[in-house]
């Protein structure tokens, strides 16, 4: 038997075994409940075999006061996206998203301040200009 063929077969079997072992460890999700957006959350191994990582961004409005919080968790299925509801005079706007990759349920950053975005834009434009001049 050809040695290179045997080596390739062994490598293929090892690769398949590693890929299966990685998925057998379970889906990793961030988990926290009712925390401010900027709060970092610890990760957990999802206990559900076909579970999903869930991000919920909620704006709770009482009178004219708004409080924004997030929930990151693992669930067996993706919950329906209920965008707006009212509970006992309290309005709640919820945006729900689901994903099935490790640590994919991170809340989307808000983009930072106007000066930060202007600096990034200026840097991008200057690097393009520099490349065209060189």
UniProtKB/Swiss-Prot annotation:
InterPro entries: CD59_antigen_CS, LY6_UPA_recep-like, LY6H/LY6L_nAChR_modulators, Snake_toxin-like_sf. It comes from Mus musculus. It comes from the Eukaryota. GO terms for cellular component: external side of plasma membrane. The keyword Glycoprotein applies. O-glycosylated. Not N-glycosylated. It is found in: Cell membrane. T-cell activation. This is Lymphocyte antigen 6A-2/6E-1. Keywords: Cell membrane, Disulfide bond, Glycoprotein, GPI-anchor, Lipoprotein, Membrane, Signal. The keyword ATP-binding does not apply. Disulfide bonds join 29-53, 32-41, 46-74, 78-98, 99-104. GO terms for biological process: response to bacterium. Residues 1-26 form the signal peptide. A lipid is attached at residue 112 (GPI-anchor amidated glycine). It is a lipid-anchor; GPI-anchor. Gene3D superfamilies: CD59. SMART domains: LU.
